[in-house]
Amino acid sequence: MRRILVVDDDLHTRLAIRTWLKRCGFRVAIADGGPNGLAALDDATFDLMIVDIFMPNMRGFESIRIFHQRAPTVPLIAISGYAFSGPETENLACLKMALSLGATRCLRKPFRPATLLSVIDECLSEAEPHRRYTATLAAVATALSEQPGAAAPSDISMERIATG
């Protein structure tokens, strides 16, 4: 079962997203802002993050950069009712900034559950090859380290094994 972290300062948004995603079979953790969201990342592993751009104790788009740095391989969907509500040229600038800071996709609030689920499916599908690659590296490292007298493989040798 896929785990999703939802970080938004708006209670109704958090609860609505959690309800939709649980009905679709996801395990969902919610956080009411940046500090609690970052703490959740320290406590658990997630397959996807949904992060509001503008929250208290975070400086706008800075939230995307911080969450992406903490979990660079986890797809991040940036959501905002503010950042993507301006004129078309302003929306495009906000979108480019969010993507350049680490967002995989962006959604403007409010959005329909079907739209969110479609974007989640796209993000998880795109991330799947990397997830399998990482799991394979971990399995090979474990198998090699369990060999009698074997030295722990380095990241470089693991990379060579995985890529041939």
Give, region by region, the residue ranges found by the protein language model.
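C-terminal output helix
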Residues: 99, 105-121
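Active-site beta3 strand of CheY-like receiver
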Residues: 44-50
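Two-component/phosphorelay signaling modules centered on CheY-like receiver
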Residues: 11-29, 101
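Short amphipathic alpha-helix used as the core "switch/output" element in two-component signaling
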Residues: 39, 61-74, 93
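Active-site residues of response regulator receiver
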Residues: 52, 80
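Receiver (REC) domain active-site loop signature in two-component systems and cognate sites
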Residues: 55
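Alpha4 helix (beta4-alpha4-beta5 surface) of REC/receiver domains from two-component response regulators
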Residues: 62, 83-105
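Helix N-cap/capping motif at the beta->alpha junctions
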Residues: 30-39, 60
